[in-house]
Amino acid sequence: MLGALQLGVLAACVVVLVPMGMAGWHLSRNKMLFFSGALFITLAVGVHLTPYFPSVTDFVSTVSSVVVIDNRRTCISLLHDVVWDVTKSPGFSTLNNNSVNYDKSWGWTSSSRVSACEFQKLSRSDASDLLNGSWVVVAGDSQARFIALSLLSLLLDSKDMESIRGDLFKRHSDYQIVVDEIGMRLDFIWAPYTSNLTDLTMGFKRNRNYPDVLVMGSGLWHMLHFTNASDYGVSLQLLRDSVVSLLPISPERGTDGPVAGSVPVRSPHVFWIGMPTLINSMLNTEAKRERMTDAMRGAYDRQLQKSKILRQSGGPLLMLDIESLSWNCGVRCTVDGMHYDVPVYEAAVQIMLNALLIESHQKL
Ligand SMILES: *[C@@H]1O[C@H](CO)[C@@H](O)[C@H](O)[C@H]1NC(C)=O
Ligand SMILES: *[C@@H]1O[C@H](CO)[C@@H](O)[C@H](O)[C@H]1NC(C)=O
Ligand SMILES: *[C@@H]1O[C@H](CO)[C@@H](O)[C@H](O)[C@H]1NC(C)=O
Ligand SMILES: *[C@@H]1O[C@H](CO)[C@@H](O)[C@H](O)[C@H]1NC(C)=O
């Protein structure tokens, strides 16, 4: 019996340590597949052996599920624990004190819980490795455009970025690029309203062609042009339904979906770009100042929670919390009280990439 227990402990260690050990590692998709495969085999062997050793069955399943899943959830929930350092740049003067005259940098807080997650700012080669062969779709309004810009800036050099920036910022248009070196395709889809995002996801479903990473968000246009939070809420619920029907394993369907551990299903990673902090007095038109008030912003936020589209309320999308990032960076990080300086979106992109790392290593 001692032998059985030791074997059980060994199996538990492998199951727990393989995914945890991968946490600091940058994996391309192929490597990810390899390690999910290795993990799957380990699990399968474990599952087949454990019936012969009933005393360790509970132990193995409890340890593996609790430790791995909890560790993953905790780290995902800590991803936005960042601090900013905003200082006057050399060109600063009281007459020249725009946001561009402040240097800003950010980093994850050094609390022990956050350090334990070993978040890291991915370098260009890390990010290229992670996204090698992927199809990334970023859809939404100007906030989404800044996310697309930040992601491309991480992957390409500044010479390439000059021309891309021009094309990407053509008003209200879509943009597509294939980064040949890493075979990554990125689509930016201009989709100012939630209904546009719903149309987009229905299109993926119709064509049975899904991106690997889907990043989307909307709200500002609706707030400005409709100023009706409950209508926004209705549109979010439609989007949620559409995304849920897209995903092979949805939170609601659970056991109806493919059985975990059977043929692996490829499921897109879906992110929500939250609205930024709005600084009413800095907004650049009368209509914006009138309609995009703090109260309206609060009502839109409540609808977002209520729609259950976000992971934190049981939905499928992981929030990139631009509000918290922009709030913490502060008034010196924006010129118009709505669009923030590039570092805010860079932070959001790094948070997204870290979430992808966590999810791809520890998905069982
Ligand atoms: C920023 O500049 C304005 C004038 O452009 C001035 O009134 C204000 O005091 C300056 N603020 C700081 C913090 O220097
Ligand atoms: C991307 O993957 C391909 C094939 O797996 C490989 O040949 C190439 O070197 C990779 N590129 C990068 C930048 O990792
Ligand atoms: C987005 O949706 C609105 C309202 O449903 C529609 O008028 C507009 O044409 C759509 N825009 C795009 C780019 O699909
Ligand atoms: C707001 O939207 C809801 C739902 O679409 C609609 O029933 C209501 O009449 C709208 N309110 C206003 C003031 O337009």
Per-range role (PLM):
Residues 1-364:
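A compositional signature for long Ser/Thr(±Pro)-rich, low-complexity
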